[in-house]
């Protein structure tokens, strides 16, 4: 995360065309906002981007259901992401979800085994991975969702401590 403004498409026409988005739906974005707030990170202080620079979806009625990108799509976009990170030069890099983590840390990386751990990487002084905020919404019940929210916020606090070590 750096001191640059966030990147996210808010224009519905851009969404329909498959432009870059922060989260496939507003609920996932709200979970990210909750986690950032709980960790003491201002949204304006976070630079947000995606591994795959298009929103892949399946239409179901009036809804657009997010589809996980295929491996070749991730591989095609990863050089662009690495170039983006070279320009941004973040102080801390939090990889949200398996797609981001595997794209930058390798296909064998498992978020479930290493979430919240400081990771050895040349991508930034601090690199860590956690779940994608929309995963909180897939928890089976309210209690599980609350536990996931707390764990997600704690993962983000690792980055917050690097950015403001007081």
Put a short name on every predicted segment.
Residues 1-166:
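A polyanion-binding, active-site-adjacent surface
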